[in-house]
């Protein structure tokens, strides 16, 4: 659906392979994939990102903290820039940041976390979205998870995830 009015995706080579492979798949589906430059200190080059931004950008995705070298990306600055482009959804991979650094998520449209990175069980994750109307369901059926992902909620896993976050 997004491809019809904003078919450009911007990411960087710093992303986790699980993100980069999805980006490459989306490119085979007709999206235009652009890579933002990285500065010598391992941060996204805000000036280059600004040059890449157009009204055709539908998604900008980046990790908050790099999983190999530990660089913290300028999420607040990126979010401020993207505010000027209402079609651009700003997703942050917060897997390495949660519980380790204070997170600034103003102007971020979605952020994802993986439970095993903060002592949760493998296979658990969290996706926080600013507006559920912006996404389509991934699994259809009973309407659980606000109609976005139907299926019986695994209460025990959810409770264990919350407990892991508290620890």
What is each PLM-predicted segment?
Residues 1-167:
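Pyridoxal 5′-phosphate
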